Structure formats: C-alpha cells, structure tokens
C-alpha cells in the first residue's frame, strides 16, 4: 500500500482588524507642539529639516526610527538620523530630486506632470512616491480624485510602495480601501469614493500584510483627532492593542 504523506502545517493566522492600523499614521510637525499621542496607530513623526537643525536638543525632536525629515533646507554632513527623508518638488525638478543620495530612504512628492510617468520614474529610481488624498471631493476629470486613483492603481505594481498625505479619518479609510482595490485589480476610483469598511475588517492576514507593504504610512496634521474619529467610525479598530509596526521604508 502506498504511503500517504503526512503534511504538517502551523496554525492558520488569526484575523486581527487592528493590524491594518498599527503604526500606520505619521504625525505631521504641526502636532509636535503638543505631545504626539502615545498610540499604536502612530508609527512616527514628520518634521521639517530646518526644525531638526534648529531644535536638535528638543525632546520632541530626538532622533528616532520613526522620524520622517522633510527637506526644506540643505542638510549638513552628517545628515540627521531619520527613518526616511521627504522632498516636495515640481515636475521640472523631479530628476534632480531622484538623483539625491541620502543615508535613509527618500519619499518624493512631485506636483504636476503625468501621474503615471512620475510614479514610474520615482519607483525606477528606488524611491517612494506620494499620493495626496486630501482633495478627493475634486471629482472633475483629471482632478485630484483621478490623480490619486491613478497613483494608487500603480502602487501594487511598483517595487517600493507609496506614502499617503491625508487630513481626516475618512481620507485614511479611503487610502486603505484604494490600496486594497489596487492589489485586487478592482476599481480604485470607486474604492476611494465609497470605501467598504466591512471588507477591510474581513481582510485575511496575508492581505493585511500585502496592503501595509504597499502603504508605507499616512501623514496627518492632527493625529489625535484622526485617531478619535477612526475609533468612532470603526469600533473594531478601537481596541488597538499594544504592538507597533509599519510599512518598510528601505
């Protein structure tokens, strides 16, 4: 009688709705005047390089793995410690930005130009692109909603993931839904306009991991308010546990 192979497998991963939010939010500098919320959804802070250089001794600006440094001035040698650096440039200066060599990953926010062309150039250079979801109400053809949808549609096919700029809890949810739609090949515009929260809560752990590998972080100006609104909107996310995490910027 032929033997029957015995296949041993580990336990199936348990769905945890909280994992999608853990370490996702990045607190923008405007919130640093007040304490940044000590919350598992906060994965770091976004600070201007000029503030880092001027206030290097400030406790709020201590070097840390979670700090995103926005390049508003020329950096000294050596550059300050950072999880990543972010530069905002118009399309005509994109090539100069892509040629920068820094001691941490670079996030490139390019205003203007063809969305597809810019996204492909940033990814090909080994950097991380930015998707702005702060004006999704602009649904005109070629407007902000279309540009965000086009950028997120490409996100699943890139090698380096994207960084999102948002202002509200609704925009954070829309960004998550847009990334999931991109990974699934669904209509990203529809996902941004009418995000399916129930579907986000049902995501398999592998899908959560894939989503967070694409969505590196969501920068918000008022994280405490966003956290409170997210908890109200989606109670299943409110019990956020204690672990911290985030997308890999490398």
Which stretches of residues belong to each language-model region?
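Expand to "…catalyze enediolate/carbanion chemistry for C-C bond making/breaking, isomerization
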Residues: 1-250
């Amino acid at each position: 009688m032929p033997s029957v192979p015995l296949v041993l497998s580990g336990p199936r991963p348990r769905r945890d709705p909280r994992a999608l939010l853990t370490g996702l939010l990045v607190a923008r500098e405007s919130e640093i005047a007040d304490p940044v919320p000590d919350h598992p959804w906060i994965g770091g802070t976004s600070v201007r390089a000029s503030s880092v250089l001027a206030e290097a001794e400030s406790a709020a600006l201590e070097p840390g793995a979670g700090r995103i440094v926005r390049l508003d001035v020329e950096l000294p040698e050596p550059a300050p410690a950072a999880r990543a650096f972010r530069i905002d440039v118009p399309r005509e200066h994109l090539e100069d930005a892509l040629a920068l060599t820094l001691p941490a990953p670079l996030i490139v926010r390019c205003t203007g130009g063809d969305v597809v062309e810019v996204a492909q150039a940033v990814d090909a250079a080994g950097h991380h692109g930015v998707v702005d979801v702060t004006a999704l109400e602009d649904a005109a053809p070629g407007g902000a909603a279309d540009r965000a949808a086009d950028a997120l549609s490409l996100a699943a096919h890139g090698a380096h993931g994207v960084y999102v700029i948002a202002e509200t809890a609704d925009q954070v949810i829309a960004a998550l839904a847009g990334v999931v739609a991109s990974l699934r090949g669904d209509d990203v515009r529809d996902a941004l306009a009418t995000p399916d929260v129930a579907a986000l809560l049902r995501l398999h752990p592998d899908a959560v991991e894939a989503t967070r590998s694409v969505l590196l972080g969501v920068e918000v100006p008022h994280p405490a308010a966003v956290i409170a609104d997210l908890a109200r909107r989606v109670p299943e996310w409110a019990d956020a546990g204690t672990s911290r995490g985030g997308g890999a910027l490398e």
